[in-house]
Amino acid sequence: MLPIRKVLGSTDFSIAGHPAVLAAGELAGHFGAELVLLHVVQPAPTTPLVPPERMVVLPSGSETEKYERDEENRSLEELNRLVVERLPKGLSCRTLVRVGSAAEEIVRLSESEEVDLIVIATHGRTGWRHLAFGSVAEKVVRTATRPVLVVQSPSQVPQDSKQ
């Protein structure tokens, strides 16, 4: 059996993501493993996303850095609250926040931390939403060199399979 000493759980703080956080905590507790809980902050936009005639002023470098720092601090507080309120007491857990592409940061951290398992949620987007936004879970599964457990929220499981 694969030894599990360190589990990486990631969250975007959505309702659909909570089951993955809980699963990561349960697995870490079951195996006596450390849980590394990660949230990735999207970087502030630095290029216009609208036509020039509708352009708004984008933040300068120092404003961008301040925005990202504020988001990191807010996210770290939210992660710590999640650990206290939702995860088993006595669990060995570290919380981390990174800025960047969610999939890339999850994979990068899984390597640098030498985790034994990545636990991630899927939001179940289909159609144009999947095409427009992509799937962080899908990108992680394709690019990670570590095992990945993808957790669906209960609302995503087809009704005929809930028996």
Can you name each region flagged by the protein language model?
Residues 36-38, 94-98, 149:
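General small-molecule cofactor/ligand-binding pocket signal
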Residues 57-75:
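A short acidic, glycine-rich active-site loop
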Residues 117-139, 157-160:
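Glycine-rich, Arg-bearing micro-motifs that act as flexible, cationic patches
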Residues 20, 47-50, 107-108, 131-132, ...:
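Short, well-ordered secondary-structure micro-motifs
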Residues 1-2, 30, 42-44, 73, ...:
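Structural beta-alpha unit
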Residues 52-56, 112-113, 136-137:
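Short, hinge-like loop/turn segments at secondary-structure boundaries
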Residues 2-61, 154-156:
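Small/aliphatic-rich secondary-structure junction motif
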Residues 146-154:
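Short, flexible loop segments at boundaries between secondary-structure elements
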